[in-house]
Amino acid sequence: MTTEPTPASATAASSAAAIEQAAHAIVEAAIEQFYELRPDLRQRHGPRGIAVCREDCLYHIEFLAAAIRNGSVDAFVQYIRWVDGVLRAHAGGSHGLGQMLELLGQGIRRSAGEAAWTAAQPTLDAALAALQGRVEGHGLYAMPPTSALARSYLRAILQGNRLLAQQLILDAVREGMPLRQVYLEVFQPALYEVGQLWETGQISVAQEHLATAITQTILAALYAQTPLAPGRGQRAIVACLSGNHHEIGARMAADFLQWAGFDTLYLGANTPEASFLAMVDDFKPHVVGLPSSLPRHIEGVRAVIEQIHANFRRDRPTILVGGLAFNLVDGLWRQVNADVWGHNAGEAVDRLVGAAA
């Protein structure tokens, strides 16, 4: 789901920048206050849990700044509802997210200034209202499968029945369903629903991983049986950067690029930034794809794009981004200085090819 942003003003942009610059000071103060107020959580979390909480708070600040810059209050509210759902399902008991948001707001006022606090307050208030149950919402993965095939496929992968799942897809392809439709109307909504089920604690991490692994196996089988399109004489590289293990979307993007005639290298999940940039230097691609599933991946993508702009000025590749993290905030792809974005891999590649025509 995307939200329509209010055009960013100079004040919003400067406030977002001030919050980003003060992020570490804001978070450190909030963490210290939070665990003083909640000794029960300090004991439960321990040093490792506190470190995770600190990292999560930096993500909250990063996403808040992006929402302010883009005028997308609803996107931040949706993100916080998702965080709340994950914490409730997996952390158990009282997790203190609302209390932490209050403390982060106080930190913004102290460390980033009154103007930044004025810009942030409506967004934080909306998120707090949502946590208190006054606003209806849904999870990050709100794209339930609607077709009978997608629902049958979802049941098969949740049961761990690879043979049935594969047979459902192969039968559909034999009966004439285009691969694009299989990818976008079966795989994507089914896996989004898997994410939603994990988010709400209805399935385990192991079940989520199994569903993903089955889909990866079927994707590979389909790709091996698909005739390649005539080459365009252009190259592409697609990768998930460090910390991003959600690679199905990236695999789909790589396949769509290959079908569009690009000689495509797919580097997979958790690719170190330095290795990716070295590959760009060696392979000299015309296009790079950097999908991002979660908001916390955005900063790494932004940093790599900055390096590409700085180091490959003469033959800079076209930069394509997408994924759930970018879908939450309209215009976020422009904020990271990408060239092309789409709601899904098919749309992104269509826009890429259309722009080059």
Regions found by a protein language model. Give the residues of each.
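Core of compact, soluble alpha-helical bundle domains
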Residues: 1-102, 106-169, 173
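Amphipathic, non-transmembrane alpha-helical secondary structure
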Residues: 81-84, 102, 170, 273-281, ...
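Long amphipathic N-terminal alpha/beta scaffold segment
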Residues: 110, 140, 162-163, 171-250
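Conserved binding/catalytic microenvironments
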Residues: 216-221, 228-256, 260-283, 290
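Cofactor-cradling patches in redox/metallo enzymes
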Residues: 256-258, 266, 271-331
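Peripheral docking tails and interdomain loops at the edges
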Residues: 322-357
